[in-house]
Amino acid sequence: MVRLLGYAPAIVAQPGERNVSLRRSANRAGTGILVALVVATTHPAAAQITFGSPADPPRIAIGGGAFDVLPNSGRQGNGATGLALGEYRFGDVLWIVAPFVGAFGTGKGAFYGYGGFGFDINFFERFVVTPTAAVGYFTHGTGVDLGAHTEFRTGAELDYRFENPSRLGVGFYHMSNAGIGQHNPGVELVTIVLTMPFH
């Protein structure tokens, strides 16, 4: 929308335009990670690409972040809110596949308990990208109603691995009911997570 203030036009972004901008930024970030992985994969000697982390023990993960980071003004209860999470990560169990269980709660009273699996893509010695998929039970509290109690979460985490081998990383995820509910708005999550060996 354009408003005239004196003789100078001022462009005022509408809520929908801001959401489109946020989604474009998120898409660019995801594209950047994908391009980096493709480049690393096509130059494996330089990037030292390996799959799985068989030497790593089971780990406890704790962290926080934001839930519903790309809000839609048409949804009741929408809007970004903080979250706190905890996970137990079993380590590589079947080839490079590592299962996990976890839960998070949000500042609006939402709760999600879930289980899933992921696999590590190690590159440049200390960096790890872990794509994951999970399914679990969700209650929305006073936040956005995702349309069903059964919700699926997909995404990836980018970590720096320390020598001990704890990790510190950031994750970006999408949650939705995959169409099993009457409506399926979906949300995005951003997390910062510290994982520590659990012996």
Where are these regions (language model features)?
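Outer-membrane beta-barrel "beta-signal"
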Residues: 82, 185-199
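Cleavable N-terminal export/targeting peptides
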Residues: 1-55, 199
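Sequence/structural signature of outer-membrane beta-barrel proteins
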Residues: 67-71, 91, 104-110, 122, ...
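Repeated loop/turn-to-beta-strand initiation elements of outer-membrane beta-barrel proteins
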Residues: 60, 92-97, 125-129, 164-170
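Membrane-embedded beta-strands of outer-membrane beta-barrel proteins
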Residues: 84-88, 115-117, 156, 192-194
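Residue-level signature of outer-membrane beta-barrel architecture
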Residues: 88-92, 119-121, 160, 174, ...
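Transmembrane beta-barrel strands of outer-membrane/channel proteins
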Residues: 62-66, 99-105, 119, 131-137, ...
